[in-house]
């Protein structure tokens, strides 16, 4: 077994042993995540839907969840659920599956590498599972909020990583359409947000340069890798 665990997480005592024991007896579960709580005890919903035409904006994502029966309320009520992807802050999988998948995609500096791994797993018919009877505390986002410079960098990288994911998993017109919709939706948010926030203004400036290179040169990589 291999466990990828964020350093800002706390596992329940001995929970890993019982989780592995259960997983050894239920071999259909191949990429495994667990329930993640924040420091206040609230569920962080550390899973989601793949990025596509129906999930690329928040408005469309809500209707997609309802249509597919994948609302947080429904999925959190189940002991085991099967989201598209699980958070990379806790991923348990067998070593041979990790090798079969080719490991983590190092084109991502941060963010979306978990979605990418799960997408490749689904493409190989490997089941992605979320277990609610095991849990950890994840101090989510604490490291990215230490100062304004880190905040701007991390939020910019989230947007860049979304474009990298699109470039990795879509081709031709589909890729161009998704890139364009993502640019439009993020631009609207950042431009209007810039009126009241210097942080959003700085993020927009960085993203604008990135978008220009992407559209004109087809360059959708992160300069952090």
Language-model-detected regions and their locations in the chain:
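Membrane-interface aromatic/basic loop that binds lipid-linked glycans or pyrophosphate carriers
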Residues: 201-225
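Conserved donor NDP-sugar-binding/catalytic core segment of glycosyltransferases
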Residues: 13-46
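A short, conserved alpha-helix in the catalytic core of glycosyltransferases
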Residues: 84-135
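Short aromatic/hydrophobic "clamp" motif used to bind/position activated sugar donors
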Residues: 2
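Active-site-adjacent helix/loop segment of glycosyltransferases
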Residues: 123-202
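The conserved acidic donor/metal-binding loop of glycosyltransferases
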Residues: 6-10
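Short, flexible, basic/aromatic active-site loop/helix in glycosyltransferases
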Residues: 51-84
């Amino acid at each position: 077994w291999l466990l990828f665990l964020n350093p800002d997480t706390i596992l329940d005592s001995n929970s890993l042993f019982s989780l592995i024991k259960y997983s050894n007896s239920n071999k259909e579960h191949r990429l495994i995540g667990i329930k993640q709580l924040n420091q206040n005890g609230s569920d962080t919903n550390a899973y989601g839907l793949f990025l596509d035409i129906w999930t690329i904006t928040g408005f469309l994502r809500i209707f997609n969840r309802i249509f597919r029966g994948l609302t947080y309320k429904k999925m959190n009520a189940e002991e085991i659920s099967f989201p598209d992807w699980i958070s990379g802050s806790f991923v348990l999988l067998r070593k041979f599956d990790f090798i079969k998948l080719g490991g983590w995609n190092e084109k991502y500096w941060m963010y979306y590498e978990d979605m990418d791994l799960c997408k490749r797993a689904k493409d190989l018919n490997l089941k992605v599972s979320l277990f609610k009877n095991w849990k950890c505390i994840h101090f989510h986002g604490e490291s990215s909020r230490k100062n304004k410079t880190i905040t701007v960098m991390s939020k910019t990288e989230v947007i860049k990583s979304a474009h990298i994911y699109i470039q990795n998993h879509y081709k031709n017109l589909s890729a161009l359409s998704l890139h364009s919709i993502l640019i439009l939706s993020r631009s609207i948010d950042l431009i209007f947000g810039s009126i009241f926030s210097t942080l959003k203004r700085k993020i927009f400036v960085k993203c604008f340069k990135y978008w220009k290179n992407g559209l004109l040169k087809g360059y959708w990589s992160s300069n952090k890798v």
